[in-house]
């Protein structure tokens, strides 16, 4: 008699059966799928990715759980969130981008636990970071940061960096600009963060907003209207963006823009920003 391993696929079972005169299954045989969640995907986009790959049993349940208090008691970083009633998805920012193994049509709650457990592991994991004399963790960097932003605020900044930056180097300059704008006085002509990436959240763009709502849609996270940070993260950032949020470059920049190839242009004044935009428009058509 042969006992089969849990989660053996059909081909393995058939091979095992052929080499034995008898066998019995001791656990439910379940096929699995490998799914990669890329940095910057939002809760809505992750739901689509999981569903497309056959890893999610109930998309609507997944989205509902992502805005519930179900996980507060198990994860302090979720329980510590503020503005919960104003967020579109409480778990936005904490579904860590990575490659995961899921059962086909896996229970939504089980899927979310895998994301949150991984995030908890990552923020407690020691790693080498430029500027630190010894290995450190995300939580330690938050604790020691001069800005005194909470972990949730850091994740919100990181999510914006992830959404706006063209590459890793750009992340540290955009981090600097965000930190500068958050502490700027009115004499600099900076009244808000004014970021396109927040304008239509939880959607990526106006085209992603349901057609019936497009003409009147207004996001609560729109940083053109709202001062300071949005109510929470706008996507799920990777570790590079999180570290950049905690370690901004030192600069006097308050503005940035990119051309169609991702080349970044930074500016200290609105006049310089407008000149950069005019320059890009002159050749980037």
Where are the regions a protein language model picked out?
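Signal peptide-directed extracytoplasmic domains
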Residues: 1-122
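Bacterial extracytoplasmic/cell-wall-associated proteins, especially those involved in peptidoglycan
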Residues: 55-56, 71-285
């Amino acid at each position: 008699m042969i006992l089969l391993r849990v989660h053996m696929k059909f081909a393995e079972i058939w091979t095992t059966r052929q080499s034995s005169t008898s066998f019995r299954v001791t656990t439910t045989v379940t096929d699995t799928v490998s799914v990669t969640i890329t940095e910057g995907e939002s809760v809505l986009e992750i739901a689509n990715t999981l569903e497309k790959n056959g890893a999610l049993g109930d998309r609507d349940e997944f989205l509902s759980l992502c805005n519930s208090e179900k996980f507060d008691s198990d994860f302090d970083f979720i329980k510590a969130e503020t503005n919960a009633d104003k967020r579109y998805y409480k778990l936005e920012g904490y579904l860590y981008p990575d490659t995961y193994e899921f059962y086909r049509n896996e229970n939504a709650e089980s899927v979310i636990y895998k994301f949150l457990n991984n995030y908890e592991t990552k923020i407690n994991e020691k790693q080498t970071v430029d500027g630190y004399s010894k290995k450190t963790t995300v939580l330690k960097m938050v604790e020691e940061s001069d800005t005194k932003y909470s972990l949730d605020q850091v994740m919100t900044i990181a999510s914006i960096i992830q959404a706006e930056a063209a590459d890793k180097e750009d992340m540290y300059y955009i981090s600097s600009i965000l930190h500068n704008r958050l502490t700027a006085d009115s004499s600099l002509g900076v009244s808000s963060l004014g970021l396109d990436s927040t304008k239509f959240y939880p959607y990526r763009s106006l085209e992603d907003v349901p057609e019936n709502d497009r003409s009147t849609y207004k996001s609560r996270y729109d940083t053109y209207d709202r001062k300071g940070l949005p109510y929470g993260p706008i996507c799920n950032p990777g570790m590079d963006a999180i570290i950049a949020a905690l370690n901004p470059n030192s600069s006097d920049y308050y503005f940035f823009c990119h051309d169609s190839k991702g080349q970044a242009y930074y500016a200290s004044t609105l006049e310089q920003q407008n000149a950069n935009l005019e320059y890009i428009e002159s050749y980037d058509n």
